[in-house]
C-alpha cells in the first residue's frame, strides 16, 4: 500500500477532484517537491505492477486527524488548530483558567506557557485569533477540505490490502494513468 497525498493534484483542480486531473496542470508551488515525490511513488507502483506483476495499490488519504495529532498553533494542520482554538476560546468564555493554563503548559503558544500572567496569555491568544466567545479562522475560506479520522483510514488501508488487487482497478484497455 502506497500512501499518496491530495497535494498531487493541480493547484486549480476542480472540486471535487476527479482522479483523471492528475498531471494536467501546475501543482501548488509550496507543495511541489513533496507532490512530485508522491507522484513518482505512484508511478513507480504502477510500473512495478505492470512490469513485475506486483500488487501495489496507491491511495490518497485526505486531511487526517486523530490521536497524538499536532495541536501546536504554529505548526499544526487546519483541523487540529481549529479544534484547539475553539477549546481555548471556550475556556476563556467560561473563565476556566485552570483548563486553559493546563493546555498551555502542555503546548505553549509562541513560547507563552500556562504559568504566564493572564494579560500575557490573553495577548498571545488574541494574536492567534482566540478571544472569549470568538475564534478567528485564517485564510480566504475558498479551499474545500475533507477530513478523515485517522483510525478510519487505518481500517480502510487494511481492507484495501486484504481485498483489492491491482487488476481490480486497472483499466484493461489503453494506458494505465493512475491506479488509486
Task: Describe the role of every protein-language-model region.
Residues 50, 64, 80-136, 145-180:
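Alpha-helical substrate-binding/gating segment
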Residues 5, 61-64:
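Active-site loop/turn elements of alpha/beta-hydrolase fold enzymes
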Residues 26, 136-143:
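Catalytic Tyr-x(3-8)-Lys segment
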Residues 52-58:
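Conserved Rossmann-fold SDR core element
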